[in-house]
Regions:
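A mature extracytoplasmic/lumenal domain signature
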Residues: 42-44, 57, 142-145, 185, ...
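Short, well-ordered loop/turn elements at secondary-structure boundaries
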Residues: 23-24, 31-34, 47-48, 122-127, ...
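Surface-exposed, glycine/proline- and aromatic-rich loop segments on solvent-exposed faces
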Residues: 30-90, 149-170, 175
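Short alpha-helical segments and helix-capping/turn motifs at coil-helix boundaries
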Residues: 21-26, 36-40, 123-126, 165-166, ...
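Single conserved position on a long alpha-helix in the C-terminal lobe of the eukaryotic protein kinase
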Residues: 96-157
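Sec/Tat signal peptide C-region and signal peptidase I cleavage site
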Residues: 2-8
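Short, compositionally biased low-complexity segments enriched in polar/charged residues
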Residues: 13-31, 113-126
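Accessory, solvent-exposed terminal regions and/or long lumenal/extracellular loops of proteins
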Residues: 10-21, 110, 160-441
Length: 441
């Protein structure tokens, strides 16, 4: 079965014997120097009893390191980095406009938490800090033994997912701390049976830039997907797994207009089938610009919300937004480790030396890579000149309205099996593509 969920770097534990699953998490990492700011928006599917989030962190976090956010910034980031669908019309071959690239317009307060007497010392567990942020009751734990940590969580009435102790062990042995954010369901709104939790952000300093995903396997029933957005001065890729880029500049048939998320899901599935174990780069672009733009660009206020207010230097419009998409199962061995990479370009309406559009990423002087897919409408009017110039694309004929680029958002819930690539691609031979295997490594 293909995954219909997005995983996260921690696991969720419920205060009942029912399993708590995470089915859609958005993660945004801001990185500058040794500082990492991690922001996440969680959707939960489970009973409304007390539940918690457990995430390994490299150091003890304090009240000022944690805050809640509003949800709109995550929708903004997702829209900017998402694959986009555009429409082009062939211009009058006898009166073409000069060829050019087409552009489109496009915390809660913190309160003290009562201290409870626990037998943590006997279990090798120490409460390093505890505080409340919004609906989150947070404790920062250190542990000398993974079994002791598991026992402590059991004593606190949490039903740890089966198989959690071996997953906790490497983090305990490496000296990691544990961010445990318990949620008070009386402070949470439930919409259609789903908890609408406030996004949460915290930051820390570490020489290593990584995301601990192995602990999330405790909630996994099989294969999981994870989308990570990184805001930094450079493009980023993973250092410990293969890197590929999503095939781009593919022309599609008009039927894709109503099934774009399903089309992209099929394209991504084909890509990971051809490159098992690889992490897919779906977007890498200056965060303050885009072309085509599916919506407003990210603004200084967005950067501040996502961490620029706690980094040494606010890069303003100098941030690069990188979107990485990973698929993994229970056999994954290592967390995702990130490294800076050279700029790439791809997914633009710029022809190469052979007069074709490249379907793969290429090295470049600046980051301009996106997953871009186009519906093209050939010229159907009269041709009244001796030397028509075909293949010049632009906006629609006079009097016809053009919709802006369509972004494939909400891919955690994109339907699978509705689109066959061979029928969706305007050039069926592209269904055999092996492209996208660019790596700056």
């Amino acid at each position: 079965m293909l995954p219909a969920i997005l995983a996260f770097c921690g696991f969720y534990v419920a205060g009942s014997n029912q399993q708590m699953f995470n089915d859609a998490t958005q993660v945004v990492l801001m990185r500058q120097g040794t500082r990492t700011v991690l922001s996440m928006q969680n959707n939960y599917k489970g009973p409304p009893e007390a539940f918690a989030l457990v995430v390994p962190v490299p150091s003890v976090l304090h009240e000022g390191d944690v805050k809640t956010l509003t949800k709109d910034v995550f929708a903004h980031v997702e829209q900017m980095g998402a694959p986009r669908l555009v429409e082009y019309w062939e211009q009058d071959p006898c009166h073409p406009e000069p060829p050019m690239e087409i552009q489109f317009a496009g915390g809660a307060g913190v309160a003290a938490m009562p201290v409870r007497k626990m037998a943590g010392a006997d279990l090798g567990v120490k409460i390093e800090a505890q505080f409340t942020v919004g609906e989150y009751q947070i404790v920062i734990l250190s542990a000398k033994d993974s079994s002791g940590l598991e026992t402590w969580l059991h004593q606190e009435k949490y039903n740890i997912p089966e198989g959690a102790e071996p997953l906790l062990r490497p983090y305990v042995e490496s000296g990691m701390k544990f961010f445990v954010a318990k949620v008070d369901p009386q402070k949470v709104k439930f919409e259609d049976g789903r908890a609408a939790l406030s996004p949460i952000r915290f930051f820390y300093d570490s020489d290593r830039f990584e995301l601990p995903i192995r602990l999330g396997l405790a909630n996994s029933s099989g294969t999981q997907d994870l989308i990570v957005n990184i805001l930094a001065g450079d493009r980023y890729e993973v250092a410990n797994y293969p890197n590929v880029t999503i095939p781009t500049n593919l022309d599609v048939t008009p039927m894709v207009k109503d099934k774009f998320p399903a089309f992209y899901a099929a394209l991504f599935d084909r890509t990971v089938e051809q490159h098992p174990g690889a992490v897919v780069t779906e977007y890498s672009w200056a965060a303050g610009s885009c072309d085509p733009c599916p919506g407003p660009t990210l603004q200084p206020g967005d950067f501040a919300t996502l961490g620029a207010d706690v980094t040494k230097e606010n890069l303003g419009y100098g941030y690069v937004l990188t979107r990485l998409h990973a698929r993994y199962g229970k056999d994954i061995k290592d967390d995702l480790v990130f490294k800076a990479a050279q700029p790439i370009v791809g997914g633009r309406e710029i022809k190469n030396a052979t007069g074709q559009l490249d379907n793969e990423a290429k090295p470049a002087s600046q980051n301009n890579f996106q997953g871009r897919y186009a519906i093209r409408y050939p010229w159907t009017g009269p041709i009244t000149c001796d030397k028509p110039q075909r293949g010049i694309w632009g906006g629609p004929p006079a009097g016809q309205t053009q919709q802006g680029p369509q972004a494939a958002t909400g891919l955690a819930f994109a339907p699978r099996g509705q689109v066959q690539l061979a029928q969706a691609l305007a050039k069926p031979d592209q269904a055999k593509f092996g492209g996208g295997a660019f790596s700056g490594s």
